[in-house]
């Protein structure tokens, strides 16, 4: 299964990174940070004034699609998102399968005020400390990649650093884990990370089981206003969109159109 493969590679990378800078030294570096992460919840919760919230993703490649954008300039893409109403920006930092880079995060942080998500396969506190050091305001934790104890521990460590957490789920078992970790932002990924198959009815199945005080993010396969409208009506607050924005002629036009879905 590709998820297991990515996790294995991530753990190998972590061994090398820890040899260069151990966890204690990394945590010491966190004390030099002057600003606190933004309160992401206020940016992602749907309101009457701004019902559609968008997390726009900086994404060069994926295991299912290969290279998505050849002429890839992460900063230019992030600036376009920031200037055209994205509520948050997701920055892929996984290097092997998604061609991401941690440096993208710090480069973008220096140029935009929009909240930033470190999108990666996080399995260790080390990666969470890195996320804060490089400028993330929130991180992704994938329920499928962690057992309940691990998810809870990583969630609590992130919150101790004032980082918010997007906990990604794909089924009822994941949802139970997410709720037991006290997640406040729950992402429903329509794509099965084991098979890459899409289930666009997943929000319809899972949202009714989620307490109303949670913020719900719909992920994968969101590519037109009809899908956004339908998922918003089911209960999604925000939409994480990456590949679609990477392929359109004008990010500005597409983002503006999506933001105005209900107008």
Swiss-Prot record:
SUPFAM superfamilies, sorted: Ribulose-phoshate binding barrel
Recorded catalytic activity of this chain's protein: 1-(2-carboxyphenylamino)-1-deoxy-D-ribulose 5-phosphate + H(+) = (1S,2R)-1-C-(indol-3-yl)glycerol 3-phosphate + CO2 + H2O
Pfam families hit by this protein: IGPS
An example molecular function term from Gene Ontology annotations: phosphoribosylanthranilate isomerase activity
Domain of life: Bacteria
Keyword Signal: no
PANTHER family: INDOLE-3-GLYCEROL-PHOSPHATE SYNTHASE, TRYPTOPHAN BIOSYNTHESIS PROTEIN
Keyword Lyase appears in the UniProt entry: yes
Key words of the record: Amino-acid biosynthesis, Aromatic amino acid biosynthesis, Decarboxylase, Lyase, Tryptophan biosynthesis
Enzyme class (EC, first level): lyase
Family: Belongs to the TrpC family.
Pathway listed: Amino-acid biosynthesis; L-tryptophan biosynthesis; L-tryptophan from chorismate: step 4/5
Enzyme Commission number(s) from the entry: 4.1.1.48
InterPro entries: Aldolase_TIM, Indole-3-glycerol_P_synth, Indole-3-glycerol_P_synth_dom, Indole-3-GlycerolPSynthase_CS, RibuloseP-bd_barrel
GO BP: any one term: L-tryptophan biosynthetic process
Name this protein carries in UniProt: Indole-3-glycerol phosphate synthase
Record lineage: Bacteria, Pseudomonadati, Campylobacterota, Epsilonproteobacteria, Campylobacterales
């Amino acid at each position: 299964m590709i998820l297991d493969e990515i996790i294995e590679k991530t753990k190998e990378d972590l061994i090398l990174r820890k040899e260069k800078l151990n966890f204690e030294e990394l945590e010491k570096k966190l004390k030099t940070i002057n600003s606190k992460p933004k309160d992401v919840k206020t940016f992602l919760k749907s309101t009457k004034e701004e019902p559609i919230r968008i997390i726009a993703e900086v994404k060069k490649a994926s295991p299912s699609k290969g290279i998505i954008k050849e002429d890839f300039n992460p900063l230019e893409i992030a600036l376009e998102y920031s200037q055209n109403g994205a509520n948050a920006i997701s920055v892929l930092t996984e290097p092997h399968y998604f061609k991401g880079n941690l440096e993208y995060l710090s480069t973008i942080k220096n140029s935009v005020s929009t909240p930033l998500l470190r999108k990666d396969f996080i399995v260790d506190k080390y990666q969470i400390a890195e996320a804060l050091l490089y400028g993330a305001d929130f991180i992704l934790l994938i329920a499928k990649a962690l057992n309940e104890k691990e998810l809870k521990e990583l969630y609590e460590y992130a919150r101790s650093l004032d980082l918010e957490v997007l906990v990604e789920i794909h089924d009822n078992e994941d949802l139970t884990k997410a709720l037991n970790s006290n997640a406040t932002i729950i992402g429903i990924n329509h794509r099965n990370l084991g098979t890459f198959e899409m289930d666009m009815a997943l929000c319809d199945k899972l949202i009714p089981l989620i307490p109303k005080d949670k913020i719900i993010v719909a992920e994968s396969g969101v590519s037109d206003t009809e899908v956004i409208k339908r998922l918003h009506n089911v209960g999604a607050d925000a939409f994480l969109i990456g590949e679609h924005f990477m392929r359109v002629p004008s990010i500005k036009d597409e983002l503006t159109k999506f933001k105005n879905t209900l107008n």
